[in-house]
């Protein structure tokens, strides 16, 4: 049994294109407890799974996701695959794994769109929203009540108390923060999730033996990894 839950960061993104149905299915097959997908709105108000605000990194096209129609986004191809809409990812994971939705936008529109989407799916168990401010957490808690869980993707450790007071169920820290006294103290306040990588020249979600040792010593509730097979069951 693993010492913590594995969250497949952007799906099984170490081996498959990020934020795709292919990557989500592969993550579940590899034993991930949750699949993470990013959430942005198209010009038509549909929730699509893109990490970046533009298509530039994936396709070379500088167009903003928010300016692209559903038709345009569904026609996008990269690394031999295509981006998923969030309802596609949810249909893949529901009943098989949990889902962490990394909400990339502030404001009420994205939360309202997510509420409609998750309600249409029947409010499946195991859905988490990743939110970055106490204000957005409070808004989401009012809108969703307890029908979803919330992890605070807080930019700084000193925002923990505000995020918990607003209704967060868990706190996310970075691998490089895990050994800090402030991060150690947070374990007494809430379940802590750790995003691997973004240190020692590693990409977000990537790690190595030293990183896994640091993370393991922290004893988190969950870890976000690009490769869900790095930690044996």
Predicted features and spans:
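Phosphate-group recognition and catalysis centered on beta-loop-alpha active-site segments
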Residues: 1-233
């Amino acid at each position: 049994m693993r010492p913590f839950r594995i969250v497949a960061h952007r799906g099984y993104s170490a081996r498959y294109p990020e934020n795709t149905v292919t990557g989500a299915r592969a993550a579940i097959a590899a034993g991930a407890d949750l699949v993470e997908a990013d959430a942005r709105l198209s010009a038509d108000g549909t929730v699509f799974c893109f990490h970046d605000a533009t298509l530039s990194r994936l396709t070379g096209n500088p167009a903003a996701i928010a300016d692209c129609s559903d038709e345009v986004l569904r026609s996008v191809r990269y690394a031999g695959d295509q981006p998923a809409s969030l309802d596609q990812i949810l249909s893949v994971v529901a009943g098989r794994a949990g889902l962490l939705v990394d909400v990339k936008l502030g404001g009420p529109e994205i939360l309202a769109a997510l509420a409609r989407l998750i309600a249409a799916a029947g409010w499946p168990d195991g859905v988490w929203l990743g939110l970055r401010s106490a204000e957005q957490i409070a808004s989401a808690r009012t809108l969703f009540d307890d029908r979803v869980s919330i992890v605070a993707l807080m930019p700084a450790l000193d925002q923990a108390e505000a995020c918990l007071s607003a209704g967060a169920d868990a706190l996310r820290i970075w691998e490089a923060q895990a050994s800090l006294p402030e991060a150690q103290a947070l374990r007494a306040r809430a379940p802590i999730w750790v995003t691997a990588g973004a240190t020692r020249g590693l990409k977000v979600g990537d790690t190595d033996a030293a990183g896994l040792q640091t993370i393991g010593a922290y004893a988190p509730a969950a870890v976000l990894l690009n490769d869900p097979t790095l930690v044996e069951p």
